[in-house]
């Protein structure tokens, strides 16, 4: 059968090669994934999550169809989860085979093809009952290829040959060795007389002579069997092992070597696609687990409509933070969020723990999950992909030895401008919190002016309420250089309580303080009243 290529993530070879060459990969670093906690949400062992992202609309839509099949067919997820450890075992065997001696290598080769056949039969038996329910071209093609493979004469012949050789090898229980002695009864040379399918048993010379039933028993020894390694040094064990394996190699080498060639040819032509699929299968199964966990809390999920890259659309209804939802297992407060001509970048202010960081991350989550091909945490979403997600979040590991904390923050912010484009997303959370509000507001206004001129989308979540008051001046300054408009958002508070509702309005820092002070009795009228009572 001809070599077959299939992918659960890419619709054709060209798209796969573009991804491998980094031509359609958005710049999303592992640091960004850690900041958004997506490495926690989708934990991969055999690949890197940052390599799974794409900017290609066709690729995203191709993946969406795969995930729809996975979500609509529970048994499909179960099937792929069963397949994962088998493929992992094959990879481990390949590694061990390359590190082992000839005998072990041949045995690993037999086990490898057994695992391949197990995997293919598992797929065929699992996909056949659900074939009429599959809609994605990836999974339909996978079923058709596996079905064709299992029906081929070559596959049937391979099974027969495997069973014959497996029986030969796996039924070996003992080896009869002939040893020549010198005049002083010291071993001089040795060779294998026979390979047996029965084990030797301990016995005694007298029993062998007197008992008729032992006389014709070739597998009862005339002395007790001794453990192979008893009384031997490590060096002696190695020498004996090596000699024994060399003898076995001579017995099996002709059939084993010819078999290994058959196995290699079969694997390369028909089964190696499973190993190539292994990281993709791990990714889609782990990602589907995330989606199922979010569904259990009855939070909305929707496959986004993907628009042209150049449209720079982001219109989302009912957005929420999926990481918080997964950790709490509760129904989340939802918000509506959009980037538009009046606000491609936002300054988000509000009370501490009022939801600023939560919504900032949520916007990053929607872009990231969309560009993995997954449904996003929202009830409606229309999105243009980004060519990178850049974050600057608080960290407890600032390298402040050379620059000081403010210097380090500025250095990290400056790095963003090395790669950011008009099609990027920038998320800044409490940046410049290491200095006073006057200095921080000045530096922040310079950064916002630069990001406006770049034309990227993003959010600056900050405690600097006065920064929101500077937005009109920043927009006025950058409009003559073609800058995109910046707008303001406010994390809501009602009667001193955080509402977690994000509103598009100008900030009023005093209102937060006034509401909270009133709640805890820290107003001038109440203070005077308490002072009078104490007199």
Predicted segment positions?
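Conserved amphipathic alpha-helical "coupling/scaffold" segments
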Residues: 1-186
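Alpha-helical initiation/capping and key positions within long helical/coiled-coil segments
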Residues: 108, 269, 273-276, 405-408
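Long, hydrophobic, amphipathic alpha-helical segments used as structural scaffolds
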Residues: 124-135, 166, 173, 185, ...
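Structured, charged N-terminal subsegments at the starts of enzyme catalytic cores
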Residues: 171-241
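A short, charged
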Residues: 215-230, 245, 345-359
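Extended, charged coiled-coil "arm/hinge" scaffolds of SMC/Rad50-like chromosome-maintenance ATPases
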Residues: 229-265, 271
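Charged, amphipathic alpha-helical linker segments immediately N-terminal to NTP-binding catalytic cores
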Residues: 276-324
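ATPase nucleotide-binding head domains, primarily ABC-like/P-loop NTPase cores
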Residues: 309-535
């Amino acid at each position: 059968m001809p070599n077959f290529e299939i992918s659960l993530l890419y619709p054709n070879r060209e798209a796969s090669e573009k991804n491998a060459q980094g031509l359609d990969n958005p710049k999303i670093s592992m640091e960004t994934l850690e900041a958004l906690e997506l490495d926690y949400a989708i934990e991969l062992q055999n690949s890197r999550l940052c390599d799974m992202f794409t900017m290609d609309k066709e690729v995203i839509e191709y993946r969406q169809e795969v995930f729809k099949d996975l979500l609509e067919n529970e048994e499909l997820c179960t099937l792929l989860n069963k397949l994962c450890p088998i493929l992992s075992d094959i990879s481990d065997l390949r590694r061990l085979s390359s590190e082992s001696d000839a005998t072990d290598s041949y045995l690993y080769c037999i086990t490898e093809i057994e695992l391949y056949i197990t995997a293919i039969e598992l797929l065929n038996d699992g996909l056949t009952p659900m074939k009429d329910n599959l809609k994605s071209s990836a999974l339909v093609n996978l079923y058709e290829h596996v079905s064709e493979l299992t029906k081929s004469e070559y596959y049937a012949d391979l099974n027969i040959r495997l069973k014959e050789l497996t029986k030969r090898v796996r039924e070996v229980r003992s080896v009869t060795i002939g040893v020549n002695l010198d005049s002083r009864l010291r071993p001089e040379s040795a060779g294998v007389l026979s390979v047996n399918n029965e084990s030797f048993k301990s016995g005694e010379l007298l029993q062998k002579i007197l008992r008729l039933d032992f006389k014709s028993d070739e597998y009862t020894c005339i002395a007790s069997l001794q453990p192979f390694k008893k009384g031997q040094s490590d060096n002696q064990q190695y020498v004996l092992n090596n000699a024994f394996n060399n003898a076995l190699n001579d017995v099996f080498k002709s059939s084993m070597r010819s078999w290994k060639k058959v196995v290699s040819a079969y694997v390369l032509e028909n089964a190696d696609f499973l190993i190539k699929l292994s990281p993709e299968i791990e990714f889609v199964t782990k990602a589907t687990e995330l989606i199922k966990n979010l569904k259990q809390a009855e939070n909305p999920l929707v496959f986004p409509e993907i628009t042209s890259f150049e449209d720079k659309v982001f219109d989302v209804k009912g957005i929420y933070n999926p990481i918080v939802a997964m950790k709490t297992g509760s129904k989340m407060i939802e918000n509506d969020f959009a980037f538009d001509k009046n606000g491609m970048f936002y300054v988000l202010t509000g009370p501490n723990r009022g939801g600023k960081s939560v919504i900032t991350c949520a916007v990053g989550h929607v872009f990231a999950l969309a560009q993995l091909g997954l449904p996003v945490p929202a009830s409606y979403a229309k999105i243009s992909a980004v060519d990178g997600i850049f974050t600057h979040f608080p960290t407890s590991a600032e390298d402040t030895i050379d620059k000081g904390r403010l210097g380090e923050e500025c250095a990290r912010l400056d790095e963003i401008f090395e790669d950011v484009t008009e099609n990027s997303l920038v998320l800044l959370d409490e940046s410049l919190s290491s200095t006073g509000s006057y200095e921080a507001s000045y530096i922040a206004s310079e950064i916002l002016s630069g990001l406006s001129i770049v034309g990227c989308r993003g959010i600056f979540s900050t405690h600097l309420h006065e920064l929101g008051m500077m937005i009109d001046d920043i927009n006025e300054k950058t409009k003559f250089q073609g800058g995109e408009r910046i707008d303001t958002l406010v994390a809501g508070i009602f009667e001193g309580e955080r509402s977690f509702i994000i509103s598009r309005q100008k900030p009023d820092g005093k209102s937060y303080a006034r509401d909270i002070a009133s709640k805890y009795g820290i107003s001038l009228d109440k203070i005077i009243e308490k002072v009078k009572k104490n007199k």
